[in-house]
Structure formats: C-alpha cells, structure tokens
Amino acid sequence: MKVTFRLVCLVFAFAFTLSAVFAQDQPTIIKDRVQLTAYTVNNQKGNYDIWTWLPSLDFRVNGPLESGAQLYVEVGYPGAPKWVTFDCSTGVIQKGSWWKTSCGGRDIGEEKGSTYTGPITFTIKMRNELAGTDSTIFTGKAKVMKAKSNEYGPKVVNHHVYWIDHDWNLPIGYVYLMPNDVYGWKLTNLNVAFWIRGDDFKMQPHVFYQGKEIGKVVFEGREIGTPGCSPDIENSTTHYVEETIPQKARWNRMVCTFYNVYGNDESGQGDGLFGPKFLMNKNPGDYEFKILWNNKLARTIKFTVKPGGNFDNGIAASSKLGNDRVIVPVTILGDQDGVWDKNAWKDAFYGNPLVGFTAAP
C-alpha cells in the first residue's frame, strides 16, 4: 500500500514538473511589438465605387518555436466572430530568441474585404500539426475607423479609407539601454521611445540629470555625438484621407538615442579625447527627458536611476510585456497631436492594460 502511494506521488510530481517546464517553454508575444493596422482595398468584390478593408498584423514572438509550429490569426466583429483567418510566416527559433512576422492585408484575398467599422477582436494562435496542438498566445481588441479619401468627384462618395485607432499608445513611453556596436553590453547608451500622432518632422531630444542638461559634448567649437530620433514603428493609412482628419490618422513611435549618455562602461577603453563619459550607473537620481517637436516642447518623461544604474519600475514585468524595456508615463504638451482620446491608455496593448501604470496628468 505504501509502495503504491509513493508511486502515485512520484508520478504526480513528475507530471507536475513536466507541466511546469512545458509552460515555461511556451512562446510569448512581445506586446509592444503587436501592431494591427487596416489595409484599405479599393473595391468591393470588383465594384470600384466602394472601398473595403482587411486586417494586417505585424508582431514578434519570443521563442521557442518548434519544428512544425505555425502562427496564425483570427479576426472577428459582431455578427462575424471568425470573419477572416490567415497564416503568418513562422520559423524555428530557440528560447532566448524572437521571431518577427507580418501577415494579412491583401494576402487574405480582396474578395473578403469588409465595410464594417467599430470594435473588433483578434487572436494570435499557434498550431503544430506534428505535435497535434493548437493554442492561443494573445487575444486583443481594437476599434476600426474610416474617413473619406482625399479624392473628389461623384464616383468617390464611398471611397473610404480605414484605420485602427492607436491613441492608447500616446501616454506610454519606454526607457532602455542598447548595446554598443563594438563592445556590446559592456558599453550601453540611453534610449527613450514615445509615440506621436502626426509626422515626425524636426525632433530635438534633450535629457536632464537633477535639472542640468547632460549628453552635450563640444569639440573645437562644435557639438559631437548629437542625439537623434527616428521612428521604429509607423502606423499610417494605405491611402490618403481627407484633409479634415487630425494628423492624417498617422501614429509613429519615435526612438531617441543619446550617444553621449551611457548606462555603463566596462569596455576598458578609457575616457578618450572628449573627457569623462556620463555614466548613469555612477549618477543615481532623477532624470527628465524633453523633446522639442517643430521647436515646441511636446513631451516630457521622468524616471529615477537607483545606485548601480537600475531604473526598472517593475511595470513591464508585472504586465508581461515580453521584453525588458522600462515603461514610463509620458506628459503630452501642446496641440500638435490634435484631438485624441486621453482615456484610451486604459485599454492599452489592445485590451491588455498595464499593471501598476497611471498616465501622466
């Protein structure tokens, strides 16, 4: 009897261990890289007087992705819960790596285009015919909107351009370090990311430590290593909308790199010609990022670095973001973004809101 009891316990423990290991090795979505957009189709089943739309999805998955794995997406709306289903390019990767894929849009088939606008749902799933499995790895919701195109004439009254509302992104920023091209993680630079609604013209980033601007290096009368910003995600319509639409229904995530502000330096190269580096791990305290957009102050972001250089606030981990970027609230100033929904962040990441995050006033 005792032998039987011990055997049952061992089998249960073994099964529990296998289950735990299996769960830890499942692929996960990098949430801030999920980007759902609307692809406008310039006909409705051959009728070019009416435009429709199809969903397009770009996302990244943390490995592992095993042999035989196939990522796919289901999209639906009220009355058509499984409107379209489409496969996404899928490779084989190990744990610790990620896979980027884009799918949907015209590849779904233009004949499946819809004129529906309003709330939609979508699910990222993974099946494996070899293993006989089919699982859900992300569920989301979004809002589809439309406006007339910028065309003129009696035949274009139903030429609508479609897009997904991404206002929820605007109050959410990211602070993180990136490795040097030569020294890797032994020498890191400060990066700050944030969203704008509109075009990314004339961006001038600045960062302050305890109220004093840092990262400015001047050599022979000229600034060197000037920080710069560029978009790493661009969400825009596939066709031009009418001029009355705020910022042309365009959202960009800007990434600003500070080449003279370092997270750490273990490269052993010394200070060099331009003097001591500014090292965040040697300068704990309060930092503030400011961006001038078209010569006007448009964003501020505050964060605190602890002794040793850590500035993580735990929001990304608690929210299962899928990467180690630090999430911070963004103060939005001025009117360059136009009219936007200031409560949209509560449904951030397509209905997967952040844990412990409060938007800046």
State each model region's role.
Residues 24-135, 164-290, 299-301, 307, ...:
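Contiguous segments within soluble domain cores/interaction surfaces
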Residues 143-163, 308-327:
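Low-complexity, Pro/Ser/Thr- and charge-rich linker/hinge segments at domain boundaries
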Residues 1-7:
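Positively charged n-region of N-terminal signal peptides that target proteins for export
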